Amino acid sequence: MDVNPTLLFLKVPAQNAISTTFPYTGDPPYSHGTGTGYTMDTVNRTHQYSEKGKWTTNTETGAPQLNPIDGPLPEDNEPSGYAQTDCVLEAMAFLEESHPGIFENSCLETMEVVQQTRVDRLTQGRQTYDWTLNRNQPAATALANTIEVFRSNGLTANESGRLIDFLKDVMESMDKEEIEITTHFQRKRRVRDNMTKKMVTQRTIGKKKQRVNKRSYLIRALTLNTMTKDAERGKLKRRAIATPGMQIRGFVYFVETLARSICEKLEQSGLPVGGNEKKAKLANVVRKMMTNSQDTELSFTITGDNTKWNENQNPRMFLAMITYITKNQPEWFRNILSIAPIMFSNKMARLGKGYMFESKRMKLRTQIPAEMLASIDLKYFNESTRKKIEKIRPLLIDGTASLSPGMMMGMFNMLSTVLGVSILNLGQKKYTKTTYWWDGLQSSDDFALIVNAPNHEGIQAGVDRFYRTCKLVGINMSKKKSYINRTGTFEFTSFFYRYGFVANFSMELPSFGVSGINESADMSIGVTVIKNNMINNDLGPATAQMALQLFIKDYRYTYRCHRGDTQIQTRRSFELKKLWEQTRSKAGLLVSDGGPNLYNIRNLHIPEVCLKWELMDEDYQGRLCNPLNPFVSHKEIESVNNAVVMPAHGPAKSMEYDAVATTHSWIPKRNRSILNTSQRGILEDEQMYQKCCNLFEKFFPSSSYRRPVGISSMVEAMVSRARIDARIDFESGRIKKEEFSEIMKICSTIEELRRQK
């Protein structure tokens, strides 16, 4: 039957229909090919916004650098990065005046964090630029490689395990005349296969030592690798994002810790909180502005958009902010926090893989690596690419582009929020000294501005003043993309406010459905998503019930586990029917074994195994929860696991779900094809790393695991732990004397081997 879509909306208030206009159903667009073009765009744009600055040359690397700070004030509405140092410092001073002690207290909190943070903090995060191999790696591997290189070059402060000591090594590494690194390479050779007598290519992986001089090392240490941001909805063009190397990460972490601590104390900051807490915080600011404007004043809200926030921010400005925020603090603390912005004002952007050329006529493909862009003849490129390359050439060194102004995406979200809030703070009447005043919300580059004034002229004047004040610190409010409404209706970080926040349910759509981890986890995640949306996103009972039925249907099609009494034929139906017929209590079968669905919206919080346990046949229970089942490679499963769910915007977020280990919680094996590539050496390192960590966790179950104090290696810690445990077990009679002495002998042997090594 045909449904007239307008009928659906007759009874729906307009604000609730907003979510139907969002581009959030279907697959998001992904990028293919290299990100080189996007990165060049970023570099060229950033320099264009700051073009009236001063050019200098970095004495260590020879990179040309553009410094727009205190540059000419803009005379038009074009975006520009000419922040004025004195204005930024004054904004900081007023922020401190309105929040007495805020900087002081945040510094004290951060100092404590700095002294306690361990190096393993840097293993969090996904892809990281690994400077030793000059490409991206998982964070843990990149860190291990960096530490390995540091130690072989006589930098050993990191052995204490404290992040601050690792950073001391980073500083020292920059003073060394040369550094020796280990790189992976592969040899190919043609050999005859004995079985088939055909020629085959054999690949062997080697590691070779390589010396890097000071200049090359500095370039690598200051390099941000770039990639294309994937899965961005609602955009025609892709854009580049950056991933910094291990030298920069630790310093950034401490700066962001300080800025986070400040943001927590600022009522206008949308970071670092999220979800319902964020909504409550925002609602407070709106309430304040509306209460004060009841009778005499008008109140308007701008749903704000800034032009190219990152590309107009400047690390030198952040340095000025940090210098001000940490005044009166100990010298070591000020130094460690000022390194991140200094490194960023000397940063290099790696241009990625380069360009792919193909000749349709000759069926040839060839890749032009980024390193060649400086010297290659431009006649091969089309016009737009040619322009890009010409523009970027003066900035190129070894396939990286010098990029002093601008901040790459997502590096200093917290600190840039502090800057934004400091301008919102200037809207108080005591600072505007006139009839209009403003307040608002800031979350990284997103803002909402609420202006109150006795009449429309006052509102206009207030907005103009805000706009011009922002220009002074390198923030460019976009007049084209911002819009103004009577206070009570606005959008901020994809929250829609209409006399209270409206649930924007469409944003959660991508996280509904079957995740594809395994049968056990998928069932659990699916129902948890529905439960969470009932709690947080106005998912009503009828819709939730429907979502649940759709989910079960989707799940059965994904795993081909239709009910045992169904007519649908799949390649699993023979086995499932047999199981169905043998089972006395059919209600006890899991959905993934062809059982019925017992979920409804009242019991979504109960894992399926627990829900059906009492209904199961005894032998089915035994098979389902059997740790000795040879077909299952079991993880030791905590009671709560984390799944990564994809909301429609923002990063993938982690969601907890209950995990019950059954024969359905399998872990798929690693793809074999990686074993024949140059990644193989890295994979072996990674597996060794994994094995060590797993072993360590066996000795220190999480309940008894405290942060190690003092310097002891993992091996020493495990040996001493083994001795203590063995003694306790022996004295309580859990192990025999022979076993006890054998354990002690093994411990001594390990220590002996360590001494010989």
Curated annotation (Swiss-Prot):
Residues 249-256 are annotated as: Promoter-binding site. Keywords: Eukaryotic host gene expression shutoff by virus, Eukaryotic host transcription shutoff by virus, Host cytoplasm, Host gene expression shutoff by virus, Host nucleus, Host-virus interaction, Inhibition of host RNA polymerase II by virus, Nucleotide-binding, Nucleotidyltransferase, Phosphoprotein, RNA-directed RNA polymerase, Transferase, Viral RNA replication, Viral transcription. Residues 55-64 have a biased composition (Polar residues). It catalyses: RNA(n) + a ribonucleoside 5'-triphosphate = RNA(n+1) + diphosphate. Residues 286-483 form the RdRp catalytic domain. One of its GO terms (biological process) is viral RNA genome replication. GO terms for molecular function: nucleotide binding; RNA binding; RNA-directed RNA polymerase activity. RNA-dependent RNA polymerase which is responsible for replication and transcription of virus RNA segments. The transcription of viral mRNAs occurs by a unique mechanism called cap-snatching. 5' methylated caps of cellular mRNAs are cleaved after 10-13 nucleotides by PA. In turn, these short capped RNAs are used as primers by PB1 for transcription of viral mRNAs. During virus replication, PB1 initiates RNA synthesis and copy vRNA into complementary RNA (cRNA) which in turn serves as a template for the production of more vRNAs. This is RNA-directed RNA polymerase catalytic subunit.
